[in-house]
């Protein structure tokens, strides 16, 4: 393996929420999504809330990259599923015959970029470059249409010196939801780390919800990325967590460098030996103990963990004035819940984190995504970072331009029936193209 020693940074990639953002209730095993199905959404607020988080992250000295919304509605999907005629006729037919398909075609779920891909940094593989495999998201119709466009976006962002791969084939047996079910544990010195893949299939199965990640998918990615077998770990997600609404691992666990925080019901008992192997291997490779904080059900009920998305907080290493500080970005729901508020205060008092910020992501949260859902974390060396396209990097001027577009052109209310209005949909596609053009300017390298 590449036991390199160089400075790495965790670039954060977020996607702007699209103008057809709505509450379709499509998320498999996603309690928040299902509970808000049919409610009126606010696409303008959703996009601005996402930009507010990006601004905060960039202000902490963390590299923040921006992707445009994927084009929606997806008329190719409607046509492939048997709807014909003009675009206006296709929309009306879909609404009357199968509104779930219409909702899927207009879904903005690609905003949750933690599901965009699984990332291996160059120091973990002999490939000599970062390797990214786009997630197939084959567990859901509305998400399965994302991978083709995601591949184009990521390939455009990571130009030279990166290995960007298409989604795994294989359908249901190879269900893959990307980085939301992957944790990388490491030191802070740029040396190779250990990779944990979390899956939900296999006995005992959940009783209520279909697991969206398979063990076979994680194994395939580990092989494909050239990861050393001794440095790869597969944890089975606890069926109770999946049934409670933890449709991804990042709803009940979070990690950063040498820290793993998880709910006691995050992992199934059959994973305990694998966790012990991880601890031994980490100390052997990284030359320091792995810090594992297990949050008990007595301290935090599983239902409260999922309602607040405490474990979906975003951990970053802030870099300001030459100093680095571990900072955690929590949903405001964590602050509003006395138990989780006390928990994060305790973690700060114990110097696990040096600072906490509470972020309002109400529109994303109602769809089932917190701060960590909205970002794809990509560890990059300084040289690799320099190869990224300048047009994707957050800047004050780019932020200002995007806010102006969103405030002027995004709707402030949207319901599913509106998605059958051809004027609304044409305007949405025009807005998405304007944003894409904004993020294609100043092309080059950073």
Residue locations for each model-derived region?
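The feature marks the mature, well-folded catalytic cores of soluble enzymes
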Residues: 2-446
């Amino acid at each position: 393996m590449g036991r390199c020693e160089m400075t790495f940074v965790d670039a954060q990639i977020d996607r702007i929420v699209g103008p057809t953002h709505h509450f379709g209730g499509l998320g498999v095993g996603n309690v928040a999504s299902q509970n808000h199905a049919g409610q009126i959404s606010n696409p303008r607020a959703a996009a601005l809330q996402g930009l507010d988080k990006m601004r905060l992250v960039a202000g902490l000295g963390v590299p923040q990259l921006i992707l445009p919304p994927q084009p929606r509605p997806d008329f190719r999907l409607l046509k492939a599923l048997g709807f014909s005629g003009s675009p206006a006729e296709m929309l009306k037919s879909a609404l009357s015959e199968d509104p779930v398909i219409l909702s899927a075609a207009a879904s903005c779920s690609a905003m949750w970029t933690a599901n965009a891909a699984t990332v291996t940094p160059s120091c973990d593989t002999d490939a000599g470059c970062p390797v990214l495999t786009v997630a197939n998201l084959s567990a859901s119709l509305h998400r399965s249409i994302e991978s083709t466009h995601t591949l184009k976006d990521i390939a455009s962002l990571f130009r030279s010196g990166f290995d960007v791969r298409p989604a795994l084939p294989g359908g249901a047996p190879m269900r893959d939801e990307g980085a939301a079910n992957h944790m990388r544990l490491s030191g802070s010195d740029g040396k190779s780390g250990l990779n944990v893949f979390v899956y939900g299939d296999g006995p005992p199965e959940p009783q209520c919800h279909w697991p969206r990640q398979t063990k076979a998918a994680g194994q395939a990615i580990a092989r494909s990325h050239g990861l050393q077998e001794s440095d790869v770990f597969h944890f089975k997600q606890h069926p109770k967590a999946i049934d409670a609404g933890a449709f991804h691992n990042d709803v009940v666990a979070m990690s950063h460098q040498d820290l793993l925080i998880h709910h006691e019901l995050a992992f199934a008992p059959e994973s305990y030996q694998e966790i012990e192997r991880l601890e031994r291997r980490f100390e052997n490779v990284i030359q320091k103990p792995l810090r594992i904080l297990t949050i008990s059900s007595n301290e935090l009920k599983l239902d409260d963990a999922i309602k607040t998305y405490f474990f979906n907080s975003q951990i970053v290493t802030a870099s300001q004035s030459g100093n680095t500080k571990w900072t955690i970005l929590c949903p405001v729901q964590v602050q509003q819940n006395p138990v989780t508020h006390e928990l994060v205060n305790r973690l700060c008092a114990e110097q696990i984190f040096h600072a906490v910020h509470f972020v309002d992501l109400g529109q994303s949260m109602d769809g089932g995504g917190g701060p960590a859902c909205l970002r794809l974390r990509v560890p990059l060396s300084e040289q690799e970072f320099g190869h990224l396209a300048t047009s994707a990097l957050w800047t004050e001027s780019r932020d200002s331009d995007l806010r102006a577009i969103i405030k002027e052109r995004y709707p402030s209310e949207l319901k599913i029936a509106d998605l059958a209005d051809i004027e609304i949909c044409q305007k949405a596609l025009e807005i998405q193209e304007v944003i894409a053009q904004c993020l294609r300017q100043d092309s080059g390298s950073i």
